[in-house]
Amino acid sequence: MNDETRDLAVLSRRAAMLGGLLAATTLPAGIQAGAAAQPIAPQDVIPLWPDVPPGGAQVTVAEEVVERPHPQGLRDRIVRGVRTPTLTPFLPRDQARAAMLVIPGGGYKHVVIDKEGYETAQWLAAHGVAAYVLRYRLPGDGWAAGPDAPLQDAQRALRIVRDRSERLGVGRQRTVVLGFSAGGRLAARLAT
C-alpha cells in the first residue's frame, strides 16, 4: 500500500470536512491549470429522482442556465430554478482511487455549475478521483420542503454516489463530499 492509498484509507469525517474546506479555498487556480491540461468530459447525467422530486407537484419555476462573463474567458454558468436535480459524473481514465460528491455554491439563489462544479470535477478526475457534481433544488423555488429541499437532494445524491463507488471498486470509506459556499453548508449538514 503506497502513501497516497494509505492517506485516502484513513480519512475520517472530520478530516474530510477539513480537507473540503481547504480545497474550497485553494483549488480554483489548480483546477484551471489541470482542466486545461487534461480535459475530461462528463460521462452522463443522472436524475436524482425517478419522477417529480418530493414536494414538487405545485412548483412552477422554469430552469434557466445563465452564461456570465468571465475576465479570463472561462465558462461561468449559473443555474436558476432547478426543477430536475441531477448528478453529473466525471470519471478518471484509470481506476478511481476515491469518489467525491461536489456541491457547488450560489447562495441558495442559483447553482454555480462551471467553476464550482464541472471545473472542480474535471481536475479531480484528472487526478484519479471519480467526481459527481450535484445540481440541486433551491429553497426559494416553492418546494414543499422549503429550506430542506437542497438537503433532500444532497442526501439522495450521496446515496447514489456511494452505490456507484461500490461498483467502481472504490468503497464507502473513500467517498467524501466537497462543497463551495452554500454547497459547503449543505455538505456540513450532510455530515450531521
Question: Where would I find each of the regions flagged by the language model?
Answer:
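Short amphipathic alpha-helix adjacent to the substrate-entry channel of hydrolases
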Residues: 114-132
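Loop/turn elements at helix/coil->beta-strand transitions in domains of secreted/extracellular proteins
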Residues: 97-98, 129, 173-174
